[in-house]
Amino acid sequence: MTARDPEALVRRMQECFNTRQFDQADDLFTPDFFSHPLGTTGFAAGKRAWRTLVTHFPDYRVVAEDVLVDHDRVAIRSSVHGIPPTDAQPVLIEIFRVADGRLAEAWGVGQGLPHDILRTTASSDDPHRH
């Protein structure tokens, strides 16, 4: 992966999540990374959310189905596996803004995900929550 390859950057982030190598993802994010879904600044909150998620759903993993790159934006549609079954294949759609070869901002929505997942990743006591 080159520092300027946004698609490889997002795929590497998913690899770190799926292999539970959360600390290896630190260098993928800018220090002021902002997560719109969590309402937090800094990747520490994201790592906490990842750890909480896999504690509750140990087999949770994401598989990139579509990746679209437009300048400094990467949109990724991922299928979600390892969670309690629902009527539809769960999907996660995320958009990332890349700055200086690192993830700087994220937006995301899920479809067909159990409500438990949303509750386990939201942390109201996060000091970096806005």
Predicted regions and their residues:
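C-terminal and inter-domain tail/linker signature
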Residues: 1-130
